Amino acid sequence: VLSPTDKTNVKAAWSKVGSHAGEYGAEALERMFLGFPTTKTYFPHFDLSHGSAQVQAHGKKVGDALTQAVGHLDDLPGALSALSDLHAYKLRVDPVNFKLLSHCLLVTLALHHPDDFTPAIHASLDKFLSNVSTVLTSKYR
């Protein structure tokens, strides 16, 4: 559960992401594909090369979903229900991949905003991404 301080930290951090959410999403995906090559199996039809249009487009979807989640911190299950259905029932993504992408998102955010990425912000973002991952995998059960 996100505390009031966590919610404030997440909103503050995400406000700095702003219009870069899609870029950061794509960068995190590229980082995940490089660091955890088994994640590529869910994207056999994608050109996974650096800067590919498909990775950029999916990165925008990731960024948009996280922006939506930040706007609904008090109702993540409601905000992400359709996305949870998609990943559980249609795409059947291994739940561990959400944790891997979360890690890569944290690294990406830290690289782009090193002065703002304090231990408190890091902890709050980690909790937020963990909550998002939990919601996205909740329908697997």
UniProtKB/Swiss-Prot annotation:
Modified positions (Phosphothreonine) in chain numbering: T8, T108, T134, T137
Swiss-Prot/TrEMBL GO biological process terms: hydrogen peroxide catabolic process
PANTHER family reported for this sequence: HEMOGLOBIN FAMILY MEMBER, HEMOGLOBIN SUBUNIT ALPHA
One Pfam family from the record: Globin
Modified residues (N6-acetyllysine): K16
Family statement: Belongs to the globin family.
Protein name: Hemoglobin subunit alpha-1/2
Modified residues (Phosphotyrosine): Y24
Keywords of the record: Acetylation, Heme, Iron, Metal-binding, Oxygen transport, Phosphoprotein, Transport
Oligomer status and interactors: Heterotetramer of two alpha chains and two beta chains.
UniProt keyword Transferase present: no
Domain of life assignment: Eukaryota
Tissue specificity as recorded in UniProt: Red blood cells.
Binding site for O2: H58
GO cellular component, one term: haptoglobin-hemoglobin complex
GO molecular function: haptoglobin binding; heme binding; iron ion binding; organic acid binding; oxygen binding; oxygen carrier activity; peroxidase activity
Protein purpose: Involved in oxygen transport from the lung to the various peripheral tissues.
Record: residues binding heme b: H87
Taxonomic lineage of the native organism: Eukaryota, Metazoa, Chordata, Craniata, Vertebrata
PTM sites of type N6-succinyllysine: K7, K11, K16, K40
Residues covered by the Globin domain: 1-141
PTM sites of type Phosphoserine: S3, S49, S102, S124, S138
Record-linked Gene3D superfamilies: Globins
